[in-house]
């Protein structure tokens, strides 16, 4: 029992065999019946259990007071304190743990075995005192007790390794909660060096790096996170932490405004995720999808500058129209490259970035549509200008209008399918947002852009998309309607909010 004093069942069931404690132990066991093996106390107890715990604690304390020099007196006090913990009387439990520390601390064992037993009891008292203080929001007292376990050479032996490393980690967590990140990092580092469990050591090493991030030490974040990546790169169980560490480096690079290094760090997040074995939809996939989206999004601003429809001077009307078609085809390929860059984001199955990718794809198509709408139709083709020189002003005006109508027909043929591509992407984004109850800048953009097209055009575009993809849901009139700020949507006749349930229901 003393060798495993951090195990809940062992703590609660240490053998108190002497007659003085037998009745108290019986009461404790009755109260403790049904408690899971991995818990010190049940989450909720009945009134009967509460009375039994209190009677057990009182009986043990009375027995100790009658025989304070009894060899099992310290363990009886600890079990009495546990009984009080189970009734949420943390202050009373803390006083008993402190009493054990005061009485056992100065004692020296006559044999190595007795010394080890006293050390185990003392470690148990310090740990439970710290735990109770933490639960009682007395963080300074908790840290003080944990630091004794972590720093006192009396607890440095192998027999107390587990309780000592638990104390290091718990102290680090309290320091982190108090935003004392430097101290937290120190205790996490010591825990990583002392702990035997592989997973606990891995997490402790990561928390050391995370403390640099928390205190906004960006250079330290890069150094510590890269160190974690190097240490655990081949560890199959570190997948999520590896991706998180890679993302922290991205954030640090962004804060330092290191644009070139940020781009490389983003790509490293994607690569780390691919090697990690993490599944789509996981927490690690969130960072990978954001990284992939950010990389893809770099192509959108240049698109606004490069996509233009301006055929320039052409010898004939036919060559002018052909030049327009060629430019639109070239621009469409450029847009398609940007659109395809967002496609991998969808595979991570993270709603926020899936929606963002759909919206940005829609934006890319609308850039092309806008370029087609605003196509430059001057200068007029040479053959047309020659004809117009010999004509009257009225004829020249008529010829120019006919030319513009001819070109506009060509442009109209090109623009409608492009707009429908955009509408389909916005519709996917809006539907995903509604299904996930997500409201952000991308979802609002999707709805706003859909409303600009109107019901008839949306229905037409979605019908075209359905013809190509049977899984694409049909459009419901008003599906993407949204109230303007400060206004409400009208409620359809016959609809009403459900009645409120009565107080007795």
Give, region by region, the residue ranges found by the protein language model.
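Acidic, polar-rich low-complexity tracts and alpha-helical solenoid repeat scaffolds
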Residues: 1-505
């Amino acid at each position: 029992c003393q060798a495993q004093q951090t195990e809940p069942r062992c703590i609660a069931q240490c053998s108190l065999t002497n007659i003085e404690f037998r009745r108290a132990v019986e009461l404790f066991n009755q109260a403790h019946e049904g408690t899971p093996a991995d818990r010190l106390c049940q989450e909720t107890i009945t009134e009967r259990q509460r009375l039994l715990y209190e009677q057990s604690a009182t009986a043990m304390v009375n027995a100790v007071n009658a025989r304070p020099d009894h060899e099992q007196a310290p363990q009886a006090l600890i079990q009495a304190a546990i009984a009080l913990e189970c009734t949420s009387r943390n202050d009373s439990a803390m006083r008993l743990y402190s009493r054990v520390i005061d009485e056992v601390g100065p004692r020296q064992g006559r044999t190595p075995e007795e010394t080890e037993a006293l050390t185990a009891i003392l470690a148990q008292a310090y740990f439970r005192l710290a735990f109770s203080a933490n639960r009682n929001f007395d963080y300074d007292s908790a840290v003080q007790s944990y630091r004794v376990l972590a720093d006192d050479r009396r607890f440095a032996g192998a027999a107390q390794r587990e309780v000592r490393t638990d104390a290091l980690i718990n102290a680090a967590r309290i320091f982190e909660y108090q935003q004392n990140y430097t101290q937290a990092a120190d205790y996490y580092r010591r825990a990583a060096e002392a702990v035997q469990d592989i997973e606990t050591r891995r997490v402790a090493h990561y928390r050391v790096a995370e403390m640099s991030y928390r205190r906004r030490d960006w250079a330290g974040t890069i150094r510590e996170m890269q160190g974690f990546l190097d240490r655990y790169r081949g560890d199959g169980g570190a997948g999520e932490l590896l991706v998180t560490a890679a993302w922290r480096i991205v954030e640090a690079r962004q804060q330092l405004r290191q644009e070139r290094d940020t781009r490389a760090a983003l790509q490293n997040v994607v690569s780390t995720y691919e090697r990690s074995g993490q599944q789509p939809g996981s927490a690690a996939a969130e960072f990978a999808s954001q990284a992939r989206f950010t990389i893809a999004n770099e192509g959108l601003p240049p698109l606004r500058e490069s996509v233009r429809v301006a055929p320039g001077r052409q010898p004939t009307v036919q060559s002018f129209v052909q030049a327009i078609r060629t430019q639109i085809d070239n621009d469409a390929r450029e847009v398609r490259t940007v659109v395809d860059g967002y496609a991998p984001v969808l595979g991570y199955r993270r709603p926020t970035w899936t929606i963002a990718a759909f919206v940005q794809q829609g934006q890319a198509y609308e850039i092309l549509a806008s370029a087609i709408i605003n196509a430059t139709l001057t200068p007029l083709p040479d053959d047309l200008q020659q004809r117009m020189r010999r004509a009257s002003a009225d004829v020249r005006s008529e010829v120019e209008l006919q030319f513009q109508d001819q070109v506009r027909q060509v442009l109209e043929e090109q623009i409608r399918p492009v707009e429908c591509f955009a509408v389909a992407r916005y519709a996917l984004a809006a539907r995903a947002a509604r299904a996930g109850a997500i409201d952000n800048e991308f979802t609002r953009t999707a709805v706003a852009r859909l409303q600009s097209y109107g019901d008839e055009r949306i229905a037409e575009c979605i019908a075209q998309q359905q013809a190509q993809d049977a899984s694409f849901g049909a459009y419901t009139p008003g599906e993407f309607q949204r109230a303007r700020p400060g206004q409400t949507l009208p409620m359809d006749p016959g609809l009403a909010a459900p009645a409120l349930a009565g107080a007795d229901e």
